[in-house]
Amino acid sequence: GQLGYDCVKEFRARGHEVHGVSSELFPLSDENVMRAVIEATEPDAILHAAAYTAVDQAEDEPALCQMVNAAGTEILARLAKEFGAKFLYISTDYVFPGTGDAPHETNALTAPHNVYGASKLMGEEAVMAHLSQYFIVRISWVFGIHGKNFVKTMLTLAQEHKSLSVVGDQV
């Protein structure tokens, strides 16, 4: 994915040995495949950036969204514990209710207002339930050279339209 690709590239540029695995080759629904990859690579750390991210579509595919973001994350967290790997889980600001006008504190009340946010919160809870040492990073507005993202969309729309309407309430 977009974030994983950029992280692998940056870590390698800094001299780290990194084994990037795409979600096509590493389906989060298949514990046997995940176990085989982890056994083969023997990671010191796992950066879990894979996710079902189609926020609107998740409302129509809640089972698939939860399988990837919650159940898949739980499997990966259990494997990280079993193999003694440090764990970094990329989550989202969608775990919050979508109100307020300031950045959220780490322990702020979570109250997802959609299937996607609820599934990512279940992923966070799985990480906390299975691991004693972990990082959970809640991000939004991912952008980069690869993949679809807000910046690319805005650049394309700006070329196609005379004016644009864009949300202005994101902190």
Give residue ranges: language-model regions:
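A structural alpha-helix within SAM-dependent methyltransferase catalytic domains
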Residues: I38, E74-A77, K81, M128, ...
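Structural signature of beta-strand start/N-cap positions in the alpha/beta core
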Residues: E17, E42-D44, K86, Q133-F135, ...
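N-terminal Rossmann/SDR dinucleotide-binding element
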Residues: G1-A45, E82, G123
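Short glycine-/acidic-enriched loop or helix-start segments at secondary-structure transitions
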Residues: Y5-C7, Q57-A58, P97-G100, H146-G147
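NAD(P)H-binding glycine-rich loop region in Rossmannoid oxidoreductase-like domains
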Residues: E31-V68, L79-K81
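Catalytic helix-loop patch of NAD(P)-dependent Rossmann-fold dehydrogenases
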Residues: D60, M67, G72-I75, V95-V137, ...
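SDR active-site strand-loop-helix element
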Residues: V21, I46-A50, F87-T92, P97, ...
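NAD(P)-dependent short-chain dehydrogenase/reductase
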Residues: E125-V171
